Each structure stands twice: as C-alpha cells, then as structure tokens.
From Swiss-Prot:
Protein name in UniProt: Peptidyl-tRNA hydrolase
Its EC number(s): 3.1.1.29
Listed InterPro entries: Pept_tRNA_hydro, Pept_tRNA_hydro_CS, Pept_tRNA_hydro_sf
Keyword tags: Cytoplasm, Hydrolase, RNA-binding, tRNA-binding
Chain's role: Hydrolyzes ribosome-free peptidyl-tRNAs (with 1 or more amino acids incorporated), which drop off the ribosome during protein synthesis, or as a result of ribosome stalling. Catalyzes the release of premature peptidyl moieties from peptidyl-tRNA molecules trapped in stalled 50S ribosomal subunits, and thus maintains levels of free tRNAs and 50S ribosomes.
Organism classification: Bacteria, Pseudomonadati, Pseudomonadota, Betaproteobacteria, Burkholderiales
Domain of life (superkingdom): Bacteria
Annotated compartments: Cytoplasm
UniProt binding sites for tRNA: 15, 66, 68, 114
Length: 211
C-alpha cells in the first residue's frame, strides 16, 4: 500500500498557481478528501498531515524546500517512519502529458524534472511511484523553465483540475495496494457522449426566418 503521498511544488504565494505546483494541488485535494490539515513540520522540511486509514497511518507531504531540494524532505520523513520507496507516491507536473490527463507509473528516469532528480539522489533509488499530472509542453525546449513557472490559462487550469479530481478516484486502490486497479482508474477517462440524432422523418420543418 502507499503510505506516503508527496506533492511537488514551490512554496510561496508567487508560485502557488504555477504549473510546477500541480503536485501541491493534488495533495491539497487529497487532504480535503481525507479531511486532514497540512501543518508545518520542521523535522521533515515541509507541510505534513497524517491520516488513519483501516488502522494504518498514511502521510501527506508538501516539501517546502523549493523544487530542486524536494528529496531532502521526502527522505527525512520516509527514513524516520521506515517507509520503503515502493510505498511512496510522488505527484508532480509532467510536460509530456497534455492538460486533462494523468498517468501512474513506478520507477524510471527523472526526465529532467529537478524535483524527481533530487528525490532519486536522496532515496538512492528511482523505484517509487509517480503520479504524472499533465501540464503540456510549450513546444520549445528553451521555454520550459518559463512555462512551468507561469500560471496556466484558465481553460488549461480547468483541465488540470479535472485530471486531479479524476485521479483521486484511485486513492482507495492506492491505499489498498491494488496498483493495477489504481492504474486502470487513473488512465481510463470517459469518452465524450455521442450526440443523439433524430430519424430524418421525425425532424420538424424549419420555421420561416430561422436562418
């Protein structure tokens, strides 16, 4: 089961609504779902909440170290409570996935994400779970830093929030350790409903002047 849920982002009001803070948004949504409140914990260099689920302690963490030092916070809490990497899930922004989608995976490279890079280094492994929240790509590599540190357009923000709410449907499976079910829930989105069409003979004649 997942015992430590981490959301990546940067602290401070100037970063709160930026794409790079999508992981923070996810943890905020999970905290609301579990009815817990994140509070500062200096020992773990972040905002922390503890929930009790089926007799097990579950931890929520938002590192307050700034993105590039996220591993310091994650490793401090994981080591103190003896949580192995395979029981950690890190929610983060993902350039290679469009807004409105999220993907669940275990292990793999950090793909240039500095928060993941530091977690790799501090845990000494990449063998932890990631929830990759799509923020889209600016199309030009040179614009990536500017892109992640800017606010998404309102329609993109709505899509990102929709994907966060959709992926939260998987949290009971994550807590139960049913990662196949969790993956299916995260990756499956409802296709748009086809528009109902009337039989030709049943259609009313257009009124004069309706054009």
């Amino acid at each position: 089961m997942i015992k430590l849920f981490v959301g990546l982002g940067n602290p401070g009001p100037e970063y709160e609504a930026t794409r790079h803070n999508a992981g923070f948004w996810w943890i905020d949504a999970l905290a609301r779902e579990l009815k817990v409140t994140l509070v500062p914990e200096r020992s773990y260099h972040g905002l922390v909440a503890r929930a009790s689920v089926a007799g097990h302690s579950v931890w929520l963490l938002q590192p307050q170290t700034f993105m590039n030092l996220s591993g310091k916070s994650v490793a401090a809490l994981a080591r103190f409570f003896k949580i192995p990497p395979e029981e950690i899930l890190v929610a983060h922004d993902e350039l290679d996935i469009p807004p409105g989608q999220a993907k669940l995976k275990r292990g793999g490279s950090h793909a240039g994400h500095n928060g993941l890079r530091d977690i790799h280094a501090q845990l000494g492994t990449s063998d932890y779970w990631r929830l990759r929240i799509g923020i889209g790509h600016p199309g030009v590599k040179a614009e990536v830093v500017n892109w992640v540190l800017k606010k998404p357009a309102p329609d993109q923000r709505t899509l990102i929030e929709d994907s966060i709410l959709h992926s939260l449907k998987a949290y009971p499976a994550l807590l139960a350790g049913d990662m196949d079910k969790a993956t299916l829930l995260v990756h499956t989105t409802k296709p748009p409903r086809p528009k109902a069409t009337r039989p030709a003979q049943a259609q009313a004649a257009p009124q004069a002047g309706a054009d």
